[in-house]
Amino acid sequence: MDILGISAYYDDSAACLVRDGEIIAAVQEERFTRKKHDARFPRQAIQYCLSEAGIDVEHLDIVTFYDKPFVKFERLLETYIANTPKGFRSFLSAMPVWLKEKLYLKSLLKKELKQVDGCVKNKLPQLLFAEHHQSHATSAFFPSPFEKAAVLCMDGVGEWATTPVWQGKE
């Protein structure tokens, strides 16, 4: 099974291709663009990963994104409501990008994937969204040498949780 993981639209966009549980290639977009902390869609990183695996987009089984935008949007709305009227200015500055792009992330990702070299426009793989911290945890656990481990993620931002704990099992 070939799975492409994508991180984009935040600091350090990147792509990683995993085949049957083994990392085939992983690279940040800034390695190609020479733009530090490049947040754009990682088209060149994806192309590199696909090239290393010897496949095209249409041969991927799954493409996964590191975040669940609707869950994050819910957190933002509830946070702004809880801090009204103090956070109103911040709310107004954040909403345009959410209403224009982030709530339509699935469509945007599909559009971007269709621009990757070798993509057959009507043959996109399944697109999944993982929870932000689950993405951190799985990327730490699965490449590790352990069959079973406690996995702690401490991060200041995500959908809701900031310090989740999991039990990793092969």
Role assignments for model-derived ranges:
Residues 1-170:
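Short acidic/glycine-rich loops and adjacent helix/strand connectors
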